[in-house]
UniProtKB/Swiss-Prot annotation:
GO terms for biological process: cysteinyl-tRNA aminoacylation. PANTHER family: CYSTEINE--TRNA LIGASE, CYTOPLASMIC, CYSTEINYL-TRNA SYNTHETASE. Keywords: Aminoacyl-tRNA synthetase, ATP-binding, Cytoplasm, Ligase, Metal-binding, Nucleotide-binding, Protein biosynthesis, Zinc. It comes from Nostoc sp. (strain PCC 7120 / SAG 25.82 / UTEX 2576). Monomer. One of its GO terms (cellular component) is cytosol. Zn(2+) binds at C29, C214, H239, E243. It catalyses: tRNA(Cys) + L-cysteine + ATP = L-cysteinyl-tRNA(Cys) + AMP + diphosphate. This is Cysteine--tRNA ligase. The keyword rRNA-binding does not apply. It comes from the Bacteria.
Length: 486
């Protein structure tokens, strides 16, 4: 089987052929650290974490780099608002990033370079561009000459002439800067402003522009050409377009073989924004505070919610969708905990074999542009089967499926789920899909049987309805009452 990836640059799905066989150099644009991470960040970093995990499972050695932008106007504005230094704001929200994203079971990147730690590398790259005639200095600022890069616009599918004509004077403040030779020239270095942090440079004191930062850090950490460059679809233009222009003009090599972009997160069909009052941070969602007025959401349910849709498609966050993800996680969790609950009783040993046919199905889906939403179907088949067998074991003391086959099913489920970052904690063992333990359910059934014996049918119906509302179905027979989780 061949692993194929959709490449934004070529607009087609292509076989993964890395610069160095068996190894993947991967970079994803990180956060600008001036606020807490929101649902859009959650999706991006869950997606790239899962892609990384999958590549490792497929046998690749992966080096994954994700930066922190720790110098930016938004950071400076936040620092002024709160009477803090830029570094204090950056460090605070870098710590918050790790606290939030690790709760979603996102593995740490191999390195997290910071812009402020790579000023010399940024200077060097700008100087290369200047020597090649692709950059020019004006009054302490340095700009990139977009007209000198013939393929500018190739990632976003735009042509410079069309962009210029379409602008019709509606360019932003930076674009309209009179010192620029072309409206779409962009800043590589910005002259210092009073009261703002600045670094010495060959062009005078100042700080780097946004786009040059990633180009310099990629070159420093991964070399001239990487295999996969990831990021949100909103970064295609201008950020990733400008990265290509800088890096490829300087190095005369492709910056990345594959450009991959995840889709946007919508909230109730609308773009998430503070002005619309639908801006939700990761910690608000997980803790049930702030903008999220409902109960706290299980981190694994958030991860499952993200993975249920193909990574390139838009994802609409609604209360109904997250509730469905919560219920789906409870089902999956029951399957993942099956071995911990019943393995000893079933006499399981240390065997870790998995079912090859199911692993092959999962891989075929993953190899098709990381179709993890399809791969989830394999997991749920196993989880539901294990849940049924668990219910039978509780009621009858044995299982219909042979013990060794159940162990292979469970091993397969745990192995494949871990590739997607879906893991159940041992302290979740007594929890069930309905939020009731087996003992709780059995106790309610005994109360119902007593009510029926006393002809208190309204109480009997109440208990049945209560259990049904929590996902437990009762089956009455002459031999007694059986139950299963629906």
């Amino acid at each position: 089987m061949t692993l194929t990836i959709y490449n934004t640059l070529t607009r087609r799905q292509e076989p993964l052929e890395t610069v160095e066989p068996g190894k993947v150099k991967m970079y994803c644009c990180g956060v600008t650290v001036y606020d807490y991470c929101h649902l859009g960040h959650a999706r991006s970093y869950i997606v790239w974490d899962t892609i990384r995990r999958y590549l490792i499972w497929r046998g690749f050695g992966v080096k994954y780099i994700q930066n922190f932008t720790d110098i930016d106007d938004k950071i400076l504005n936040r620092a002024k608002e709160q009477g803090l230094t830029m570094a204090e704001v950056s460090n605070r929200f870098i710590d918050a990033y790790f606290a939030d994203i690790r709760r979603l079971n996102v593995l740490d990147a191999d390195e997290y370079p910071r812009v402020t730690e790579h000023i010399p590398e940024i200077h060097q790259l700008i100087q290369i561009l200047e020597e090649k005639g692709l950059a020019y200095a004006v009054g302490g600022d340095v700009y990139y000459r977009v007209e000198r890069f013939p393929s500018y616009g190739k990632l976003s599918g735009r042509e410079l002439e069309q962009m210029q004509a379409g602008a019709s004077g509606r360019v932003d403040a930076e674009d309209s800067e009179p010192k620029k030779q072309h409206p779409f020239d962009f800043a590589l270095w910005k002259a210092a402003k009073p009261g703002e942090p600045a670094w010495d440079s060959p062009w005078g004191a100042g700080r780097p522009g946004w786009h040059i930062e990633c180009s310099a850090m990629i070159r420093s950490k991964l070399g001239a050409t990487i295999d996969i460059h990831g990021g949100g679809g909103d970064l295609i233009f201008p950020h990733h377009e400008n990265e290509i222009a800088q890096s490829e003009a300087a190095m005369n090599q492709p910056l990345a073989r594959y450009w991959t972009h995840n889709g946007m997160v919508m909230v109730n069909g609308q773009k998430m924004s503070k002005s619309l009052g639908n801006f939700i941070t990761i910690r608000e969602l997980l803790d049930g505070v702030g903008s999220w007025k409902e109960d706290p959401v299980n981190p694994m349910a958030v991860r499952l919610f993200v993975l249920q849709a193909h990574y390139r498609k838009p994802l609409d966050f609604t209360e109904e969708a997250i509730a469905t993800a919560e219920n789906s996680w409870k089902t999956l969790k029951e399957g993942l905990l099956f071995g911990y609950q019943y393995g000893e009783k079933l006499g399981w040993g240390q065997e870790s074999a998995i079912i090859p046919e199911l692993a092959t199905r999962f891989q075929e889906l993953g190899d098709d542009d990381f179709n993890f939403s399809g791969g989830l179907a394999v997991l749920f088949e196993l989880a539901k089967e294990l849940r049924r067998e668990g219910n039978i074991l509780v009621h009858e003391g044995t299982t219909k499926t042979p013990s060794d086959e159940l162990q292979r099913q469970w091993n397969t489920l745990v192995t494949l789920a871990k590739i997607l970052g879906l893991e159940a904690k041992l302290d979740d063992e007594t929890q069930t899909q309905a939020g009731l333990s087996d003992t709780d359910i059995e106790a309610l059934i005994e109360q119902r049987q007593a009510a029926r014996k006393n002809k208190n049918f309204s109480e009997s119906d109440r208990i049945r309805n209560e259990l049904q509302a929590q996902g437990v179905t009762l089956i009455d027979s002459p031999q007694g009452t059986r139950w299963h989780r629906s």
